[in-house]
């Protein structure tokens, strides 16, 4: 989305408020409550309130404003961001060994996101619905059922796209942030003493006074910056400047005012700790605020769901996940997609989490490990980009990395205390996703290498066929080829069993480049290998969906005319068996077989009419 047009800047900035800041914008619902709820051994004490507020404020400044908005967002791939993009950028100018390490870091970060995404909708919506306890305490038993109902409706509408509903996101979230600011300012005016907490000395005094307990309490403070990765991940949708402008003009002031307003309330009324956010509002505003909070948390959940769809598509296109059905819900916006399998798997996981944890305070114990783990990895990857890609001074880069890690590592370490009380959940989910992604990538590479090693030379085969041609039949045959310069298995088996060849043979390779988009000028490369053989290589970015009909159109413009309904597509269907291996590699091989059996078939991936496809089987040992 371009920001060159100054007239569109306010609209883009407003849209960024509606999508990018949903998660971090709903953190005031539960953050300060969890910090001062008594779980760390101290109650609502003046020094504790000032200490937590100071920590929250300076985390928002250092982590969000300086680290992500100023530094990390400099690293973009054709305007796109996200942990996998950062991984790709970091590995461009490094040795093979270093690249492997960076890839592992990027995959761990992506896996952490999958672990986090299960918790975000649950804790956000439950925190909003828990406002019922203030309005009508007798309805507290309805919190879990109502949360499930709200999220069920949200997941059900995903298949229809969020284009129409999405237009309401921005004004609702802008209203939300303005209400945050007004409620906080109202309380601060009544007790301006709370503004002393802006001084970082209070954060230092907090550590000195409470010692070990203060370190553990960082696990609650980090709730104030959950969703920070969305700022970088959504950079491609809105651009750097609108995201930064939205933060510094609307989001940051509103969050600070609300957190400090809650602190001012607690200094006067410590009993308000049961839900300081909703108790900021006058009685007459509780129900409207409850409704607005529910809408804001739904929007925050929607942003996370859309984020997991985008990450999944990127992982599929880069070869880290098996192909799956991806539906475009908008003809205008390529980023609006729906992945049915991911949608309903995520829904099931979220419902299980809500039923199991029952209250947002219990879920808060599970939140944070994945977020802070990703923060550590982002620091390492982004500074690698600064050194290798931007060629910054190595001492400056080292200084920046140390500064980032001095914040990230204590936050991550403090969250490890949550491991047994719920932190195991995102880590377990992340481990599962990491295992799946590394298994698919490594076993796929092993399979392609084996096909290359046991394949016949393409040039020699074509020369032999032209010299001693088999029976030719009219028409065009397209053979999907994964490996260049090697004869596709489907071509070999067609000659072996049918002993015929079409008049024109096209060897088609579809590949994904290390970029979000590929310009149409570079989309197709055509090479005539002989009078009757052509090789076509079609390149796509990881944000694009390969389409054979489009490839044919491009071929026609280059002089190679093809008609979809007059062409036969030959594909090989590998029947895989696991060979002799150590037991742990056999397990990985069996997991790959399971993933491969459930992967989307090639004709469906590339939108080829089923009645034009001929699949020839072959057995391959991995």
Swiss-Prot record:
Entry-linked InterPro entries: K+_transporter, K_trans_C, K_trans_N, Kup
Function: Responsible for the low-affinity transport of potassium into the cell. Likely operates as a K(+):H(+) symporter.
GO cellular component: plasma membrane
Record-given protein name: Low affinity potassium transport system protein Kup
UniProt KW Amino-acid biosynthesis keyword: no
TM regions (residue ranges): 9-29, 49-69, 103-123, 137-157, 165-185, 213-233, 247-267, 276-296, 337-357, 363-383, 396-416, 419-439
Gene source species: Salmonella arizonae (strain ATCC BAA-731 / CDC346-86 / RSK2980)
Protein family (similarity comment): Belongs to the HAK/KUP transporter (TC 2.A.72) family.
Keywords noted in UniProt: Cell inner membrane, Cell membrane, Ion transport, Membrane, Potassium, Potassium transport, Symport, Transmembrane, Transmembrane helix, Transport
UniProt-listed PANTHER family: LOW AFFINITY POTASSIUM TRANSPORT SYSTEM PROTEIN KUP (PTHR30540:SF79), OSMOTIC STRESS POTASSIUM TRANSPORTER (PTHR30540)
Gene: kup
Membrane topology term: Multi-pass membrane protein
One Pfam family matching this protein: K_trans_C
Matches recorded under HAMAP family: Kup
Broad class of where this protein is predominantly found: membrane
Catalytic activity: K(+)(in) + H(+)(in) = K(+)(out) + H(+)(out)
Subcellular location: Cell inner membrane
GO MF, one example: symporter activity
């Amino acid at each position: 989305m371009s920001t060159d047009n100054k007239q569109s800047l306010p609209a883009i900035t407003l849209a960024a408020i509606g999508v990018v800041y949903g998660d971090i914008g709903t953190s005031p619902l539960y953050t300060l409550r969890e910090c001062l709820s008594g779980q760390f051994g101290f109650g609502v004490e003046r020094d504790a309130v000032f200490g937590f507020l100071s920590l929250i404020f300076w985390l928002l400044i250092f982590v969000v404003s300086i680290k992500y908005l100023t530094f990390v967002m400099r690293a973009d791939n054709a305007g796109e961001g996200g942990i996998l993009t950062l991984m790709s950028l970091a590995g461009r100018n490094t040795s093979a060994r270093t690249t492997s390490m960076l890839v592992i870091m990027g995959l761990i970060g992506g896996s952490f996101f999958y672990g986090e995404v299960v918790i975000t909708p649950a804790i956000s919506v439950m925190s909003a619905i828990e406002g019922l306890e203030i309005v009508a305490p007798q309805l507290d038993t309805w919190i879990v059922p109502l949360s499930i109902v709200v999220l069920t409706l949200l997941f059900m509408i995903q298949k229809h796209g969020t284009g129409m509903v999405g237009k309401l996101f921005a004004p609702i979230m802008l209203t939300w942030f303005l209400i945050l600011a007004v409620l906080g300012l109202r309380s601060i005016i009544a007790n301006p003493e709370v503004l002393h907490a802006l001084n970082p000395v209070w954060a230092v005094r907090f550590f000195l006074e409470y010692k070990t307990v203060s370190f553990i309490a960082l696990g609650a403070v980090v709730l104030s910056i959950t969703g920070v990765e969305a700022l970088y991940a959504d950079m491609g949708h809105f651009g750097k400047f609108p995201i930064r402008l939205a933060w510094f003009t609307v989001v940051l002031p509103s969050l600070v005012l609300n957190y400090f307003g809650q602190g001012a309330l607690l200094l006067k009324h410590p009993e308000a700790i049961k839900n300081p956010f909703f108790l900021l509002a006058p009685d007459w505003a509780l129900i409207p605020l409850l409704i607005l909070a529910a809408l804001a948390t739904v929007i925050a959940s929607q942003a996370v769901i859309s984020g997991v769809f985008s990450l999944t598509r990127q992982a599929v296109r880069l070869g880290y996940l098996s192909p799956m059905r991806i539906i475009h819900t908008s003809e205008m916006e390529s980023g609006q997609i729906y992945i049915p399998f991911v949608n309903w798997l995520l829904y099931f996981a979220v419902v299980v989490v809500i039923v199991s944890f029952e209250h947002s305070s219990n879920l808060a114990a599970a939140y944070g490990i994945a977020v802070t783990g990703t923060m550590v990895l982002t620091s390492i990857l982004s500074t690698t980009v600064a050194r290798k890609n931007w060629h910054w001074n190595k001492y400056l880069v080292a200084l920046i990395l140390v500064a980032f890690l001095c914040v990230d590592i204590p936050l991550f370490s403090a969250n490890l205390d949550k491991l047994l009380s719920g932190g195991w959940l995102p880590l377990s989910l992340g481990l599962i996703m990491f295992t799946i992604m590394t298994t698919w990538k490594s076993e796929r590479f092993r399979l392609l290498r084996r096909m290359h090693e046991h394949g016949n030379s393409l040039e020699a085969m074509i020369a032999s066929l032209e010299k001693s041609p088999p029976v030719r039949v009219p028409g065009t045959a397209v053979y999907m080829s994964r490996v260049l310069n090697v004869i596709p298995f489907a071509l070999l088996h067609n000659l072996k069993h049918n002993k015929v060849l079409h008049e024109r043979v096209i060897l088609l390779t579809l590949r994904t480049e290390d970029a979000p988009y590929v310009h149409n000028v570079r989309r197709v490369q055509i090479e005539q290998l002989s009078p009757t053989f052509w090789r076509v290589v079609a390149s796509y970015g990881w944000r694009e969906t390969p389409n054979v009909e489009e490839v044919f159109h491009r071929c026609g413009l280059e002089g190679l005319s093809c008609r979809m309904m007059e062409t036969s597509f030959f594909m090989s269907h590998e029947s895989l068996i696991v060979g002799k291996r150590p037991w742990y590699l056999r397990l990985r091989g069996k997991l790959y077989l399971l993933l491969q059996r459930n992967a989307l078939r090639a004709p469906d991936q590339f939108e080829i009419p089923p009645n034009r496809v001929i699949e020839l089987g072959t057995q391959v040992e991995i």
